[in-house]
Design a protein with these regions (language model features):
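Cell wall/extracellular polymer interaction/catalysis modules
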Residues: 1-50
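Exported/periplasmic cell-wall-interacting domains
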Residues: 2-4, 44-50, 59-149
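Conserved hydrophobic/aromatic pocket- or pore-lining residues that grip, position, or stack substrates
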Residues: 18, 55, 82
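Active-site donor-binding loop signature of nucleotide-sugar glycosyltransferases
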Residues: 32-34, 57, 92
Length: 149
């Protein structure tokens, strides 16, 4: 997918970094906080899924919560949310500044300023004055997200 002009997001669980690529050229790098169980099994532990995904839904802000026993939380006005697999998303995290260390319930946390940059760089585009956008295979595929150890 590293074809000339193709945008894609590379996330390393081990180094806790996110790199934005345009083809084979890196254009932005920042620290992240992925799932607190590191390389554990997603779905059974608080780890981030690994694999190749696409951003399929974006929200300027949203409420995020969990119904998992012993891991309940509710966070309102989470900024710059980009879902890539089920309830897993890249998003801004205003509640901590511990980037570069595992910490989340499985999402990929970014500093709000970094999340904003990624949000406007990645597709699907959110039209002016809209709050959210959804990718459609028929009209526009979301940006590739590659998450690996």
């Amino acid at each position: 997918w590293a074809k000339k002009g193709t945008k894609w997001i590379d996330i390393s669980i081990v180094s806790q970094t996110l790199t934005l690529w345009e083809g084979d050229r890196p254009v932005y790098v920042t620290l992240v906080s992925s799932g607190k169980d590191g390389l554990g099994e997603p779905g059974k532990t608080l780890s981030t899924p690994r694999g190749t995904f696409r951003v399929y839904q974006k929200h300027i802000t949203t409420t995020m919560d969990s119904e998992v026993a012993d891991h309940e939380f509710e966070l309102r006005d989470v900024p710059w949310v980009m879902y890539f697999k089920g309830g897993y998303a890249l998003h801004g995290a205003y509640w901590h500044d511990d980037f570069g260390k595992v910490r989340s319930h499985g999402c990929v946390n970014l500093a709000p300023i970094d999340a904003r940059f990624v949000f406007f760089w990645a597709s699907p585009d959110v039209p002016l004055h809209w709050h959210a956008a959804y990718a459609s295979d028929a009209t526009e595929q979301g940006t590739i997200v590659y998450i690996h150890p």
